């Protein structure tokens, strides 16, 4: 077998002059070769083990001119050209049955006088394939994100399996090409068999992504009605805590009673719905968080009755205020206000079809079916008409539904799905100020910790990584980092 790092002697760049645990200083005698070098060029250094090559990144180039850099421990009076190389890994000609394997670790460090060669041209192309574990001749199964800046003929690949098996992060300042990178990845993912991905498009900037394998969905706006491509997320999909974060004013002195009565009414009306559907056998197993439809109008009527209730006194014919009389007034007002808010049409629409027992199935089919049987694998969800004050709640609602369905599914029936979280700092914040933000964080932190067990991968996308939750970032293994200022 011929390795990719077989060089002729006239290709020699230099030899190792000094070495420590992570860097090596290379002596370069040929001035022409020194002039052809650039910072960030890749080099290979001869290893003491047969079939292994140490890979390094050029971090500094110094010409013989008496330049002094005591901080770098270089000889004050240089009589030869040197380059400083940061060691980044080891290339193996063969490992088991695999050929051209790159490992991000050092089995050895260079020895003095070890030969150093530049990685360029065809060797750079082959090495980039090795880095992303692309089998030669099978480039179409991997994801291309661009070309190596120092040699534009060398393609930069990402191994799709490795990218999505672990949570990923794509960061870069505005204008650095972050959105282009995301779009490029999605265009290639969409072409793959059985692809399944969701993109949370917060500002509608990915509407131009078109093709037979893309589905564009939009969270309903104020004037939207039930139709293909329009998403309605009815209130009964919210968990108890999510509903309280939206409706309850925790500074109210009556907040504990309001929360208790709300929970009682939710359970009651969910059971009433099941009873009306002839599904009494399910009543014993439902919880506050079970996605069972119920009528908000009927629940408000019941709460209003409790708020105005008068009960008999001990003296015949006399009445007094009931135990909850006047305590639910502000809570009911908040419910009514949300109910009438046109901006929340996607949640509080009075469309009767949103109270169907099988609406959850229809929603999950829109969100989660992979690219099979004519279905489109990449779903782009436009949140541009969702009010910013409840955006974290609505985005996390969809993420939670996806995670919960994956969790409930039998192992053999699960299909892996990737969730691309664009503008993640808006709904996965490092610091929270509102209970709505807390509810969102609970969902995404759980997915970051447990999602891989159930086939749910996160791709966190942000131009402000310092404002993204640290727990979510710490659970990510793959990083694509562009120019950053935040």
Provide a role label for each language-model segment.
Residues 1-171, 185, 412-415, 427-431:
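Basic- and hydrophobic-enriched, low-structure N-terminal and domain-boundary segments
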Residues 140-222, 470:
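Glycine-rich phosphate-binding loop of nucleotide-binding enzymes
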């Amino acid at each position: 077998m011929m390795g990719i790092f077989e060089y002729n002697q006239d290709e020699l760049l230099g030899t190792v002059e000094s070495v420590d645990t992570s860097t090596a200083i290379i002596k370069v005698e040929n001035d022409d070769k020194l002039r052809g070098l650039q910072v960030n060029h890749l080099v290979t250094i001869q290893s003491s083990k047969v079939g292994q090559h140490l890979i390094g990144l050029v971090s500094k180039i110094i010409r013989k001119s008496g330049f002094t850099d005591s901080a770098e421990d270089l000889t004050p009076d240089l009589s030869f050209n040197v380059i400083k190389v940061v060691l980044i890994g080891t290339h193996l000609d063969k490992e088991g049955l695999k050929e051209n394997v790159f490992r991000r670790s050092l089995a050895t460090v260079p020895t003095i006088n070890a030969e150093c060669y530049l990685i360029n041209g065809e060797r750079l192309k082959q090495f980039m394939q090795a880095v992303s574990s692309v089998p030669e001749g099978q480039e179409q199964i991997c994801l291309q994100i661009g070309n190596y800046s120092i040699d534009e003929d060398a393609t930069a690949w990402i191994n799709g399996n490795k990218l999505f098996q672990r949570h990923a992060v794509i960061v870069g300042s505005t204008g650095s090409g972050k959105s282009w990178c995301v779009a490029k990845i999605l265009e290639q993912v969409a072409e793959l068999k059985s692809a399944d991905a969701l993109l949370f498009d917060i500002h509608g900037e990915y509407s131009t992504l078109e093709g037979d394998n893309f589905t564009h969905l939009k969270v309903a706006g104020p004037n939207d009605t039930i139709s293909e491509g329009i998403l309605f997320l009815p209130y009964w999909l919210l968990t108890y805590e999510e509903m309280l974060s939206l409706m309850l004013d925790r500074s109210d002195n009556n907040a504990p009673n309001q929360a208790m009565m709300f929970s009682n009414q939710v359970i009651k009306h969910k059971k009433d719905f099941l009873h009306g559907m002839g599904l009494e056998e399910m009543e014993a197993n439902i919880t506050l968080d079970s996605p069972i439809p119920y009528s908000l109008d009927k629940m408000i009527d019941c709460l209003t009755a409790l708020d105005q209730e008068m009960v008999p006194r001990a003296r015949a014919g006399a009445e007094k205020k009931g135990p909850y009389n006047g305590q639910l007034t502000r809570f009911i007002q908040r419910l009514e206000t949300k109910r009438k808010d046109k901006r929340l049409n996607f949640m509080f629409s009075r469309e009767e079809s949103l109270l169907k027992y099988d609406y959850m199935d229809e929603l999950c089919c829109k969100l989660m079916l992979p690219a099979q049987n004519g279905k489109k694998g990449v779903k782009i969800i436009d949140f541009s008409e969702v009010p910013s004050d409840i955006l974290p709640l609505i985005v996390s609602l969809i993420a939670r539904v996806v995670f919960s369905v994956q969790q409930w599914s039998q192992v053999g029936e699960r299909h892996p799905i990737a969730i691309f979280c664009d503008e993640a700092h808006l709904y996965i914040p490092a610091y929270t100020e509102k209970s709505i933000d807390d509810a969102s964080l609970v969902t995404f932190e759980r997915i970051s910790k447990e999602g891989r067990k159930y086939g749910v991968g996160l791709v966190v996308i942000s131009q402000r990584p310092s404002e993204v939750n640290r727990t979510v970032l710490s659970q990510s293994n793959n990083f694509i980092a562009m120019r950053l200022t935040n």
